[in-house]
């Protein structure tokens, strides 16, 4: 005998009434634990829609929402439970102290801002500390200042990515959100996080042959974190001494090319005047040499990633200008050379290799005009799948503190439901 529709509905209602309490309890247990993961899940789901549909400028909304969500999630790590467990370093507390001093000071001159930054975090890069001071005057807690700086760094990266690859820009942006660089930089290396976003924009301008603009953005990046000056110098050496195109431009245009070269040289001279003082350089070198860092895990990772990047570029015939390839190879050589006498410096420079990878990946999608849209969608799907797997590995291996030990999940378990 078949059940009629009313009987079936009554049966479902009875089941719901008998187990309603269990259902509610289950929701109260699941929602607080699942909600912190929803922004991450939504980010990857949105990337799938970008692959399937041409969303165009709607990607700006998605990138902004993802940046806000990740900035919020990354600031929920609780340093009091242990810096290692929270996926942070000692500098995170130093930055918090500096932000707190900025918020407590009623008036603070430029020199006082720099002195506070040097005393708290050991770095006197003016652009970062002036930016932090401005943000600190707008918000009440150091945690909000930290979140805003994370948001700024992510949006800078998004600007560079979208300029290179409009169609699949959000997919590439999600790949950046899946790297170890994201979690490392947004914690105890927030200065370098902002500088990395500026470096990506400078690399994009270099690909477009806007050399003066690239030099200007590179100088701003160096004023945010001095390590970015190494990337700037590597690109400048390639452009000024190894570039055939720029040399031909200078010869063909009697006035314009020479003026452009002169502006670039003056910009480098200004960088040397600001960051090249003996006191500044020696303080940086002594600080880095005093750090005890053993092991060669990052060196092995750099070698493997560099070889895979070159192999990937050769197999897929990535069309990149000669200067970009030489700048990347020169920067890798500098990283390895620096690691011989100052491993801590090399480890910091290593983080910028992801700037090359991401911008070049965008240029790959942008430059391959002969490929069909289906092939590009396939490559974007593989990139998204690999990024998701890599993110799971990184979080489970090194950044569990983002979700446990006072992190996101514990934060919500202590919320309104419990």
Swiss-Prot record:
InterPro entries: EpsG-like (IPR049458). Its main location: membrane. One of its GO terms (biological process) is polysaccharide transport. Keywords: Cell inner membrane, Cell membrane, Membrane, Plasmid, Polysaccharide transport, Sugar transport, Transmembrane, Transmembrane helix, Transport, Virulence. It comes from the Bacteria. The keyword Transmembrane helix applies. GO terms for cellular component: plasma membrane. It is found in: Cell inner membrane. To S.marcescens SfuB. Probably involved in polymerization and/or export of exopolysaccharide EPS I which functions as a virulence factor. May play a role in export of EPS I or its intermediates across the membranes. This is EPS I polysaccharide export inner membrane protein EpsF. It comes from Ralstonia nicotianae (strain ATCC BAA-1114 / GMI1000). The gene is epsF.
């Amino acid at each position: 005998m078949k059940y009629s529709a009313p009987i079936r509905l009554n049966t479902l209602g009875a089941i719901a009434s008998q187990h309603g309490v269990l259902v509610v309890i289950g929701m109260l247990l699941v929602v607080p634990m699942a909600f912190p993961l929803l922004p991450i899940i939504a980010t990857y789901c949105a990337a799938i829609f970008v692959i399937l549909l041409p969303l165009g400028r709607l990607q700006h909304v998605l990138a902004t929402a993802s940046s806000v969500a990740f900035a919020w999630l990354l600031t929920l790590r609780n340093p009091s439970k242990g810096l290692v467990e929270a996926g942070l370093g000692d500098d995170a507390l130093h930055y918090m102290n500096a932000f707190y001093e900025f918020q407590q000071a009623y008036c603070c001159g430029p020199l006082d801002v720099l002195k506070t930054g040097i005393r708290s975090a050991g770095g006197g890069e003016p652009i970062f500390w002036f930016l932090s001071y401005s943000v600190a005057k707008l918000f009440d807690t150091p945690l909000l200042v930290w979140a805003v700086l994370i948001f700024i760094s992510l949006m800078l990266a998004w600007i560079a990515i979208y300029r290179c690859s409009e169609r699949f820009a959000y997919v590439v942006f999600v790949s950046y959100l899946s790297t170890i660089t994201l979690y490392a930089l947004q914690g105890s290396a927030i200065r370098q996080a902002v500088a990395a976003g500026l470096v990506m924009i400078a690399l994009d301008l270099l690909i477009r042959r806007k050399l003066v603009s690239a030099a200007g953005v590179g100088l701003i990046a160096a004023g945010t974190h001095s390590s970015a000056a190494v990337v700037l110098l590597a690109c400048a050496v390639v452009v000024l001494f190894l570039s055939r195109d720029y040399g031909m431009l200078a010869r063909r245009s009697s006035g314009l090319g020479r003026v452009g070269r002169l502006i670039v040289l003056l910009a480098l001279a200004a960088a040397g005047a600001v960051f090249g003082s003996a006191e500044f350089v020696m303080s940086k070198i002594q600080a880095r040499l005093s750090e005890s860092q053993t092991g060669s895990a990052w060196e092995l990772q750099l070698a493997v990633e560099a070889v895979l990047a070159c192999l990937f570029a050769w197999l897929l015939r990535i069309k990149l200008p000669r200067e970009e390839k030489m700048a990347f190879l020169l920067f890798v050589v500098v990283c390895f050379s620096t690691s011989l006498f100052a491993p801590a410096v090399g480890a910091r420079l290593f983080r910028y290799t992801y700037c090359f990878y991401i911008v070049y990946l965008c240029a790959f999608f942008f430059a391959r005009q002969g490929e069909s849209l289906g092939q590009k969608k396939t490559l974007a799907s593989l990139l998204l799948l690999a990024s998701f797997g890599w993110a799971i590995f990184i979080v489970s291996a090194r950044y569990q503190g983002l979700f446990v030990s006072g992190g996101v999940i514990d934060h919500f378990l202590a919320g309104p439901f419990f």
